[in-house]
Design a protein with these regions (language model features):
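Bacterial carbohydrate/catabolite-sensing allosteric modules
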Residues: 1-151
Length: 151
């Protein structure tokens, strides 16, 4: 399943596309995927996930969340309602924020090289201040799976 953000920004849309692509690449149907839309904050995702659980909506056995905040909020809601993570439902996040290391169970996540991204963005800004570029620049960076205990 996918815990997608209720905010419609490019990063989250790209993660949704990546989720669907991975589902198809593993021979599964995206039509059968369980997708829940949650607020992209711990508190918002917690509240939204409680509503989903309490409504009786079917839950997936595993979820990829658009960010770690959503994953952490969902884990807290699942645990409050008696689910065991990862035994009943596994969850992986994206961003590798520090809160993911201290939640129980520690969150499996995708790490992004934030320092490199910041340095690259600053260098690009300086270049554009010196010589304006009439088009946007998109730079893709590699990510790393950080295996912890939520999967």
């Amino acid at each position: 399943g996918h815990l997608c953000s209720s905010y419609r920004i490019t990063n989250f849309r790209e993660r949704t596309h990546g989720f669907h692509r991975a589902v198809r690449e593993h021979g599964m149907s995206t039509a059968k995927s369980i997708i829940h839309e949650l607020s992209p904050s711990i508190e918002g995702a917690f509240s939204d996930m409680l509503e989903i659980i309490d409504s009786g909506t079917p839950l997936a056995g595993a979820y990829f969340a658009d960010n770690d905040l959503i994953a952490i909020g969902a884990i807290k809601a699942l645990k409050l309602r008696g689910y065991k993570v990862p035994e009943d439902i596994a969850i992986a996040g994206f961003d590798n924020i520090s809160e993911g290391r201290v939640i129980d169970p520690a969150l499996t996540t995708i790490d992004v090289p934030r320092k490199f991204m910041g340095q690259t963005a600053a260098a690009q800004l300086i270049r554009e201040l010196k010589t304006p570029v009439p088009h946007s620049v998109k730079i893709e960076v590699s990510t790393t799976l950080i295996k912890r205990f939520s999967v």
